[in-house]
UniProtKB/Swiss-Prot annotation:
It is found in: Nucleus. Expression is abundant in the gastrula dorsal lip. GO terms for cellular component: nucleus. The gene is hoxd1. Residues 200-259 bind DNA. This is Homeobox protein Hox-D1. It comes from Xenopus laevis (African clawed frog). One of its GO terms (molecular function) is RNA polymerase II cis-regulatory region sequence-specific DNA binding.
Length: 300
């Protein structure tokens, strides 16, 4: 209360400061009453019986009945304090309100607080804003104020959701052939009995037509490649050394398989071993045939 009320001491009379009161205010006179020694307390005039005011200082302090503060204010604000607006929500209280004997609340109002409140004499403070009253009033309204049509416009019915296009509809996009290719998922590495996991299988290399043509041309002349030649071909075809090496291994196995099946004639070996020519049987020398066949002159 000291932060909102300022008193001006004039001898034995205390009056409210004009900072809190309006232009036409009434002074509330208080009489000093000595309680013990230098302690002084002020009681309103007529609030305490005369017998209690003349008690001896050495007696124990008596309990006093609750008193009422009657201060009247003008409804219109003064010209000096134009920042205080006169409204039902922000008007000062106290002109026609008295202290409640049961609860002991002093209603107050101020422009610093945007609402109505009450000060409790025992040190507690209860405060309630106008917004809470409005929210409570809105909660008490029935839910029937919202028509059924508005609720349906907010949340659509279950049958109004759009359905995806079916394959039989015209708007369904046709699937291309390249979209139908099934690719096998990569195989997971299986741990061995010693706990060592084998590396996963490498992805199969898809060679282009140009790469296959160049590799077949090289295989026609040389079925076995040196490391230098293998690296040279790999760089020219944008491949690595391992890919060229594996392709030549597979190509040689394919060639041998065809020869065993008889689809291809036996071709002379290519490479360094091809320099050694083998003589056909009809070109053998006479001496070789004579030594192999028995002589006619030999006796039995």
């Amino acid at each position: 209360m000291n932060s909102y009320l300022e008193y001006t001491s004039c001898g034995d009379v205390l009056a409210f400061s004009p900072k809190f009161c309006r232009s036409d205010h009434r002074n509330m006179n208080l009489q000093p009453y000595p309680r013990s020694g230098a302690d002084h307390s002020f009681m309103p005039v007529g609030g305490v019986p005369g017998s209690v005011a003349h008690q001896a200082p050495h007696q124990s302090p008596a309990l006093y009945a609750p008193c009422s503060l009657d201060v009247a204010y003008e409804p219109t604000p003064p010209s000096d304090y134009s920042f205080l607006h006169s409204s039902p929500d922000y008007d000062y209280y106290g002109s026609n309100h008295q202290i409640e004997e049961t609860g002991g609340h002093i209603p107050y109002g101020s422009s610093l607080f945007p609402g109505n409140g009450s000060y409790i004499l025992n040190g507690q403070l209860s405060y309630r804003t106008l917004g809470e009253e409005t929210q409570m009033a809105q909660c008490k309204e029935p839910l029937e104020v919202y028509p059924g049509g508005n609720l349906q416009s907010i949340s659509p019915s279950p049958g109004t959701y759009p359905k995806p296009a079916s394959p039989a509809s015209d708007s369904y996009v046709s699937t291309f052939d390249w979209m139908k290719v099934k690719r096998n998922p990569p195989k997971k590495s299986i741990p061995s009995e010693y706990g060592v996991t084998s590396p996963p299988c490498n992805v199969r290399t898809n060679f282009t037509t140009k790469q296959l043509t160049e590799l077949e041309k090289e295989f026609h002349f040389n079925k076995y490649l040196t490391r230098a030649r293998r690296i040279e071909i790999a760089n020219s075809l944008q491949l690595n050394d391992t890919q060229v090496k594996i392709w030549f291994q597979n190509r040689r196995m394919k060639q041998k398989k065809r020869e065993r099946e008889g689809t291809l004639p036996n071709s002379p070996p290519s490479g360094p071993a091809s320099n050694f020519c083998v003589k056909p049987p009809h070109l053998k020398s006479v001496n070789e045939t004579a030594t192999l066949s028995p002589s006619k002159d030999a006796s039995p």
